[in-house]
Every structure is written in structure tokens, then in C-alpha cells.
């Protein structure tokens, strides 16, 4: 694969270009071979870019789009009502081969609907799934689906497991252990769809299926790929992010309570900073839409500069690893 070219929906998210522009500049500084296309309102983008006079504009250019998809707009409105929206135009650049990937912090439902409409799914895939990395005791695991598919059949869960395993392999995990998230590890536990999915996965050739996993096992690193429907996955992800933020805040507050605590806190500061970095949601920001004929990464809408950089890094890595092509090559051997 040539140098990654990433199209960015510069108007999406809570902070829009005021986050996207500095994050893009920082990303280019650490990725000398990548190129970025900022899609959005040229006047605003050029004004923000003018604050970086030493920027190599051959590696970052602006592509005009006059409309923005709001966070409260329905996917159907995004599909029909705004042909020049920054999100849509960025995806069209990928569809037309002018960019290798799209990154957006905008409306998740609209991004999924437009991605399916413009990029299409890979052969054999019914629905794309959202996947991201979550921290564990042993490093991280890949969790999917994160909300794209609230109701899933057993076949959908099977497809998610296959896609998650192939993606984990592409990103460096050897023979990833695949598990279904469940209310227990015994075979009798779980609803009918989870049980049927487990039966399908047990028969799959070339897939390292390890059975069921509970929520605490996920964080102990008992699996490399954890599969669930989007309803459960989204709640789990948001709860995890909230817990990480609460723990960080509580630790910081405790080390402010009294002189002795402040002294201990000063000594422990390097360790605490490392711990905070290990579990910080910004480090793991960026959910990939697996199963499309193109690379799309969704950044958290509230992500600041560091988090958006993480989403850009994930997109660039998937471009370098030719993830859609690798998925296509493996899926035909693993899908039912």
C-alpha cells in the first residue's frame, strides 16, 4: 500500500475543526508518509490552518463541503437531504479512490448509513460492525459490536466474530482467542441467539473460539476478540469509559487530601501518569466499521485532540495493513 491518504470529516463532532485541525497537524508530525484531506467549510479551515505557517500543504489539503450533518439528524435525513455534507463528501473520496480511509467524529447513525450506501459491504457480510480496542491486564482486546447493530441474529454474531478475528490478526495478534460475551461461561447460559452463535463458532475451521466470557474476564485479558450485540457492546464501552474517568478522578482527589497524601502523591506521580495513560479513553479512541469495502473509523464525538489523533492512527494502520482486502481474502473461507 502506498502512503495513507485519509479523508477527514472536519466539521463533525462536538468541537469540529477546532479539534480536527490541531489533531491533524500533530498526526502529520509523527507520520511523515501520510497525507490528509480536510473536508468542510474552506474559509474556516483555511483560517485555522493559517496559524501553522510551516505546515507542508502538499500533505494536507482542503476539500470544500458546504453542509454539515447534525448530531441529532436521523440517518434517513443524512442519506437524502444533504448531498454536500462534509461526512458524505469524505466518504465519496474513499469510494472514488481519492482517499484510502475516512475518519469522522460526527453522527454515528448517519456515518454508518452513508458508509453502507456509498462503500457497500464485503461479499457475504450482512451488516458492518463497529470494533475498538479496550485495555486489559494483558494489553488489550478487540470488542465488537459497539452499537451499529442493536438486534443481532446468531449468524450476525458469527460474522462479527470472523471479522474481529481477521482484523485482530491483521493488527498483529497471532491466532486470536475469540469469545462470546455472556452472563456466564457454562454452556447452558445465555439467550438463544448467543447459544446458536456459539454452536456455529464451534464448527468453524481456522477460528480459535474459546467459548463464553463474562465481563470481568474481558478485563483480565482472557480473550483477544470479544463479540456481542451492539446494545450490550455500547453499554459496556460507555460504562468502561465512565469507570476509567471516575477512578482517575478519585485517585487524584485522594492525593490532594492533606499534606501526607500530597507528599505520597508527588512520589507516585510518574506511576499514576503511566496508569492514567494506560486506561485513558483517548488512547483507545477510534472505532472501525468492519465489513465495508473501504476503511471508515468513527472518533468519539466528544474526543479532544489526543483522542482524534488516536482515530487517525488507527485509520492509517488499517490502510497500511490493507484491512478490507485481507478481510475479503479470509472471509470467503470462514463464512457460512
Curated annotation (Swiss-Prot):
Pathway annotation from the record: Lipid metabolism; phospholipid metabolism
Keywords, sorted A to Z: Cytoplasm, Lipid biosynthesis, Lipid metabolism, Phospholipid biosynthesis, Phospholipid metabolism, Transferase
Major subcellular location class: cytoplasm
Reactions catalysed according to its record: a fatty acyl-[ACP] + phosphate = an acyl phosphate + holo-[ACP]
GO cellular component: cytoplasm
An example molecular function term from Gene Ontology annotations: phosphate:acyl-[acyl carrier protein] acyltransferase activity
Compartments where located: Cytoplasm
One of the Pfam families matching this protein, by short name: FA_synthesis
SUPFAM superfamilies to which the protein is assigned, alphabetical: Isocitrate/Isopropylmalate dehydrogenase-like
Single GO biological process annotation from the record: fatty acid biosynthetic process
Top-level enzyme category: transferase
EC number of the protein: 2.3.1.274
UniProt cross-references to Gene3D superfamilies, sorted A to Z: Isopropylmalate Dehydrogenase
Domain of life: Bacteria
Similarity comment: family membership: Belongs to the PlsX family.
Its biological purpose: Catalyzes the reversible formation of acyl-phosphate (acyl-PO(4)) from acyl-[acyl-carrier-protein] (acyl-ACP). This enzyme utilizes acyl-ACP as fatty acyl donor, but not acyl-CoA.
Subunit annotation: Homodimer. Probably interacts with PlsY.
Entry-linked HAMAP family: PlsX
Name of this protein: Phosphate acyltransferase
Organism encoding this protein: Pseudomonas aeruginosa (strain ATCC 15692 / DSM 22644 / CIP 104116 / JCM 14847 / LMG 12228 / 1C / PRS 101 / PAO1)
Gene that encodes it: plsX
